Amino acid sequence: MNSTRDPFNLRSKASLTAPSAFSLLQNAANKTASQAVESTKQAVEATKQAIQDSDMSFAIPRNVPNFENAQRKFEDNVWSKVTGNEQGLPMYKDKPTGGYGYSGGAKGRRGFMRSKRGMGLIALAVLGLIYWLGWSRGGTAIGLESDEKDRGKSLASKISGSAGGKKSKVDWEKRRLAVKDAFLLSWGAYEEHGWGYDEYHPVSKTGRYMAEPNGMGWIIVDALDTLMIMNLTKELNHARQWITTSLDYDKKQDVNTFETTIRMLGGLLSAHYLQETLPGLKPENANEEDMFLEKATDLADRLMGAYESPSGVPWASVILKDGKGEASHADGGASSTAEATSLQLEMKFLAYLTGEAVYWEKAEKVMQVVDNNGAKDGLLPIFIYADRGTFRGNEIRWGSRGDSYYEYLIKQYLQTQKQEPVYQEMWNESLNGAKKHLLTYTKNSHLTVLAERPDGIEGHLHPKMDHLVCFLPGTIALATTGGIPLAEARKQPTWGKQQEEDMQLARELTKTCIGMYKVTATGLAPEIAHFELDDPPKMYRTEVLASKSNLETDIPEGEGWKSDFNIKQADAHNLQRPETVESLLYMWRITGDDIYREWGWEMFQAFVKHTIVEDNGGFSSVSNVNTIPPPLRDNMESFWLAETLKYMYLLFGPNDLLPLDQIVFNTEAHPFPRFDASKKRFKTGWERIPRDEKGNLVPEKVEEATATASKPTSI
């Protein structure tokens, strides 16, 4: 790996002034075309012809080039530069403006275009742009393609006026389209160099199957709903064709139960849901409408073997061909607590779609067994034995191996339209436990930190926070409001002081997560951050503090907020993770504060600047966020497409696309609808063992619960 790579001249002295993400994507796009100079005269002539034809309201200009043609892209680029409109040349596209903010056809400007002066200005602008952008020296500025109903939009047409600023209005639609272009660059590279592979290595431009033959569809299935949300119909059809002809789960291959559930099962279920919900996504062949659901059911039936443990807690992995579950090959054979308890959204939605109670029963049995352990203050150790249903060790953290247990508590409550209050009760208990035992403040700037207890609740406080923890601030806001705007939530009769405090906690934790980005040389967050605390540490349970810094300025001599962060070499890698931008999406939609969008835009620019791969390889995770340029790890995570870019696209888009009060995202960002479980006669099939005033299980009730837990759940 060449750590000094600079394929787009991004790191020369002149470029250290942080070029925008648009300009960087444009430079990447420049490498994909070669006909701009030769097409200059043709573009001018085509423009003249379009002017002459403008009297015909529905006339298509003569000599319309193919949408794939560089001439077409060049013409659209020129048109957008001259008119200031992001659309391509008029009458080239047939897609009208639709819902969810999808862009439509261009509107004519016939009054201006009929004049000779207008024609002359356009021709002059064409030549001026050629000189300004350096096309006369052999460069191009053509941009990336969109879907087949919306092609011809050059990237350059999207960068005009996009940067915004304090004195100008930000064009969030242009920023959203920039995210779409980043996705297309990533997807196009994968299509060209790694199609069908479960792993894609953008630097070496190779891939690898997780299972032979044809793999698991790890990247394709995980990205399905992002393709749908971005309305990329051409790319979606390619993916659908591959799934139809090549995806087969009848493999003698052991797979991780959790990862396969959240990525593959979740991706297929979400694709089925969105195909029925968003316009224009159903396949042309009606016989293929249930294909995603059929694949999901086949996969789920194979995963059922993982739940056939003595306790009901799923085995860490399962062999797909025969459905045989297997214990973890590490951690003393124990399963990850988060992995065992983050399967419920997927299984419950599948049960609702199919009417098959077995999926519901298996999923909720896990929750009962885990809760029957009576973890103190709702804080669970991060490992659990599948055969015994008891915890291994007492390490507590909301990061790796703990995170999504807490996430799925409140999301289960919301998924079934608040019909299962037991999960809200468990969420509240766990959040209060975190406030009591884990929440602390940094020494200098009082940033709020969710620390860890490696030796249990009574052990020492470890000032470490995984990036994975950054799901929490958005989830707190979601739990507090139910996903409706804050202004509406405050009108609810249940709103009070506690809810205001929780929203403030969400704001402060979001700020800490953003600090993980702003503190590094690249503007990308490390995998893990450590923090400077007081000795003894100030705790949230004794006093609620507001951070002293706005993260935009720092005090010299190391006394500012940056000195509160300690990024260790072993933790300095960035894996393109989505947790922070997920929280930004929730915080923006719930509070309406533009700062969360602005922070998201800064993150996106940093990803584009520092993780883009030369020769149209796409984007890669990096090894050190404090090195410029950061060494590339030569891997594109599937959640870069499934989560990170999806959340950014939604963050910059309209709020009525996947409203937070109508859907829940699983932990892989696959959206599921909230549904009325009672319509399928589903309900919670278990009850919690009562706790005493100290939060301990009532002994006499434990025996009763043990006796009933061995009986099948009746729904």
Question: What residue spans do the PLM features occupy?
Answer:
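Glycan-recognition and catalytic cores of secretory/periplasmic carbohydrate-active enzymes
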Residues: N2-K31, A36, A43, K48-I715
